[in-house]
Amino acid sequence: MKPLASLRDIKTRINATKKTSQITKAMEMVLTSKLNRAEKREIVRPYMEKIQEVVANVALAARASHPMLVSRPVKKTGYLVITSDRGLAGAYNSNVLRLVYQTIQKRHASPDEYAIIVIGRVGLSFFRKRNMPVILDITRLPDQPSFADIKEIARKTVGLFADGTFDELYMYYNHYVSAIQQEVTERKLLPLTDLAENKQRTVYEFEPSQEEILDVLLPQYAESLIYGALLDAKASEHAARMTAMKNATDNANELIRTLTLSYNRARQAAITQEITEIVAGANALQ
């Protein structure tokens, strides 16, 4: 009876693994479709770069006198961290959270020296478990977020810098390179000192004044950078989860092959044992 029981156990494992493989394969196909849609949204990047060029020219013409363009003594640092709402995405969340956590531990001696703004339930849970100061959060964003979905937290984030809640803001997210490569990225978002590094210069005539234009343009520009990073992170999330599901499917298929081989060997051994017992019984009767 033992070989039969062993065969049943192996067969049960094979069936269970096949069901798991079917689920992960279906998820992989869905995520491939989501990634394709997310990649199409990446085409906004050249437009954002052009906007940056225009904003830089306006800022340089105004001699960088706007508060959002000027560095000030840093009493408190803000960290905007983009994670996902769900797991099953390989190292997508752990890589970015590890970098943020290590950076904060290195830079700050007290929680009073920094504040965290987090997108995604995984990041929110991570920081709350460690009693780290989260001042803003947003979760349950759609897989293909629009600017309207992120506008409120982006507006509040820029507002917190403007009112002096923190004196600089860093943004952490996964930059999408390709379906198989995503890079954890740290970017200094505020103040917008990188605009001064833009060497391209075009002469404009302004109506109204440069200062009035910057009052409207710079907050909107900073908000658009947050949205651009979110789109980047979403594409990375779909790619990481798609890769994780593909690996899970491949591992399940390999396990099925191994179990099938074990099943066939066990079945052959059981048949051989039965034949041996029959022959032995026949010999005993002679």
UniProtKB/Swiss-Prot annotation:
Pfam families: ATP-synt
Protein location: Cell membrane
One Gene Ontology cellular component annotation held by this UniProt entry: plasma membrane
Biological process, per Gene Ontology: proton motive force-driven plasma membrane ATP synthesis
UniProt cross-references to SUPFAM superfamilies, sorted A to Z: ATP synthase (F1-ATPase), gamma subunit
Propeptide: 1-4
Major location (coarse): membrane
GO MF, one annotated term: ATP binding
Membrane as UniProt keyword: yes
InterPro entries reported for this sequence: ATP_synth_F1_ATPase_gsu, ATP_synth_F1_gsu, ATP_synth_F1_gsu_CS
Key words of the record: ATP synthesis, Cell membrane, CF(1), Hydrogen ion transport, Ion transport, Membrane, Transport
Recorded topology in the membrane: Peripheral membrane protein
Subunit structure: F-type ATPases have 2 components, CF(1) - the catalytic core - and CF(0) - the membrane proton channel. CF(1) has five subunits: alpha(3), beta(3), gamma(1), delta(1), epsilon(1). CF(0) has three main subunits: a, b and c.
Family listed: Belongs to the ATPase gamma chain family.
General function of this protein: Produces ATP from ADP in the presence of a proton gradient across the membrane. The gamma chain is believed to be important in regulating ATPase activity and the flow of protons through the CF(0) complex.
HAMAP family hit by this protein: ATP_synth_gamma_bact
Protein name per its UniProtKB record: ATP synthase gamma chain
Organism field: Bacillus sp. (strain PS3)
